[in-house]
Amino acid sequence: MATPPLVPLLLLLLLLLPHAHHRLALRSVLATQRAQDSPAVHLINGLGQEPIQVLTFDLTRLVKASSSFELRTWDSEGVIFYGDTSPKDDWFMLGLRDGRPEIQMHNPWAQLTVGAGPRLDDGSWHQVHVKIRGDSVLLEVDGKEVLRLSQVSGTLHDKPQPVMKLAVGGLLFPPSSLRLPLVPALDGCLRRGSWLDPQAQISASAHASRRSCDVELQPGIFFPPGTHAEFSLQDIPQPQTEPWAFSLDLELKPSEGSGRLLALGTPEDPNWLSLHLQDQKVVLSSGMEPGLDLPLAWGLPLQLKLGVSTAVLSQGSKKQALGLPPSGLGPLLNLWAQPQGRLFLGALPGEDSSASFCLDGLWAQGQKLDMDKALNRSQDIWTHSCPSSPGNGTDTSH
C-alpha cells in the first residue's frame, strides 16, 4: 500500500487538536514543509564575504528557539551562520575550522570559542541542529549531541534588544571582530534550512548565489571563464638554490575552451612565462618567444619545472623542454627577489578567456597551495569543489 503524503496526513491530525493549538501547529507544519521542499543553495553569493540571506526576528514573539539545516562541503573553514542582537555586545557564530564545527559567542554571560564534533568536510550531507534551552546551547550533528554549553546565555526573551538578525553564509561585522578570526567564505551547499521561529520573522533579504547545487559536484578548485587568482612568490615555497630549480605540479581535470592556465611575472608584465589551454593541449611560452605544446592526458599530473636555462613541461612519459633565452633567464630568477613577483592562475584581469577548468590540486615545490590564502582572487572561483562537467559551473539555477 502506498504511504500517504506527509502534509495531508499531518493536516488531518491537526483537525483533532484543540482549537487553541490549531493555528500554531498548522503554521509549524507548513513552515517545516517549505524548508523540506526548498532546493539546496550555495553558501557563497559571488559578492565577497556577504551572507546569502539575512533574516530579522522579533524575540518577543519567539516560540521556537532552534535552527536546523543540512550541509554538504569539502571546504574545511568558513561561516555557516551568524546571529546578533548587538554586533558589539551580543553575537553568536557557527562555522567550520579544520573541518569541524566551531561555536563562537560573545555576550554578557559568556565569551568563548569551542570546537566539537566530527569533520563535516567529506562531501556528504550532514544534518545540524542548534538549540537554545534556557541558559544552554546544544549542538547536534546527524542526530547526536556533540556539544552542550551551559550558563552561556540569558533567555531570548530577556535580551536587552528585542530584535535579532540572523545571517546565513556570512557575518554582519568584519572577520577581525571574531574572537578567533577565520576565512568566512564557505564553499558548500545548504538545504532544508529552518531558522528560529517563522512566526517571529519580521523581514528577510537574500543575495542569489551564482553557483548551482543541482549539478553533480566533486572536490577540487574550479575556475569559470574569465576568473583569476594570484599568489605573491614570497608567500609560496621558495626555489631550490643549488642548483636553482622551481617546480609547479597541477592535477588538471577535463577542461573546456581556450585561455591562460597560469603565468609567472609581475602585475606590469605578467608574461614572463605562461601556460595556455588550447584545443586540449597546453602551450608553454616565454615572453614573445615562440612556444611549445603538449597534448593533455586527463588524469595524469602536469608538471612545470624551471631550471637554470630551461623550462620543462611534462605529463606522464611525455616531455617538452623550452630553452630560456640568456637575456630572459636573469629577470625570471629575479622574480623571487622582488615584492611584485607573482604566480597568476586563470585569466589575467581584463583578459578575454573562454577557458573553464578544474584543478584537483596545485603544488609549489611539493607543497599544496591553499586558494583561500591567495593574495587576491575572483569571488566566482570555487575554492573546494568542481562541477563534474566544466560547462555546468556557470549554471545559476537552483
Curated annotation (Swiss-Prot):
- Per the UniProt entry, the signal peptide is 1-31
Coarsely, its chief localization is secreted
Which CDD domains does UniProt cross-reference here?
LamG
Keyword check for Protease, yes or no. Answer: no
Location(s), subcellular: Secreted
**Gene Ontology CC terms:** extracellular region
The domain of life is: Eukaryota
Q: Which InterPro entries match?
A: ConA-like_dom_sf, GAS-SHBG-PROS, Laminin_G
Annotated glycosylation sites: 376, 392
One MF term in the entry's GO annotations: steroid binding
Q: Where is the Laminin G-like domain?
A: 41-213, 220-386
Report whether DNA-binding shows up as a keyword of the record: no
For this chain, the annotated S-S bridges are 189-213, 358-386
Entry keyword set:
Disulfide bond, Glycoprotein, Lipid-binding, Repeat, Secreted, Signal, Steroid-binding
Known partners and oligomeric status: Homodimer.
What the protein does? Functions as an androgen transport protein, but may also be involved in receptor mediated processes. Each dimer binds one molecule of steroid. Specific for 5-alpha-dihydrotestosterone, testosterone, and 17-beta-estradiol. Regulates the plasma metabolic clearance rate of steroid hormones by controlling their plasma concentration.
Identify this protein by name: Sex hormone-binding globulin
What is the scientific name of the source organism? Oryctolagus cuniculus
